[in-house]
């Protein structure tokens, strides 16, 4: 959603990928933006995480679903950009992935193995006249380490109003089977304090969803949505399954 003095600066998604699974992360820019996309597995060991995706790959697609870039092992020439955008350093020679690409409109990054494990996907605004306006991620999620964690940063001097959704059951209408029947959405601030949560949605949000280009949710469904006004700073959204359930879920911002 729009704001005069604030904007989305970056997005990060952490989840667990099973064998032969992929994580889809979409983002939209209004105008041309240079974006840095990273898929990190081995480097997460430095933060105490285990069961990591050993060799993540990134494939980047445009709005016409044409592949426009891909990467397996990151190029050390990008290391200075990591510092510029505030990203943590990667170990030289690691099998993490990263690519730099000018994007305009809707782009989709698909992250896959080989193998299985936890992966962190990051999308950074590096520069350009446009702005990052929305983001989404879809994956099979459950509880605990199998929850989907999405980090976002609101940049600027004013608060920004965001519509945040976790969609499970509605995905069946788009040919996606096994949608998470009852997703729960929790939002945390920079101090890890929970500031909002929901496991349903209010039908009064339906017109608002249409105004920002989001598809309608089915009245009475157990999909979840929150409308929040957030001050500048970092936030984390967590999506998990109620009652230790698992299934495909779409996170939208």
Language model region names:
Residues 1-253:
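A sequence-level detector for low-complexity, Ser/Thr- and acidic-rich stretches
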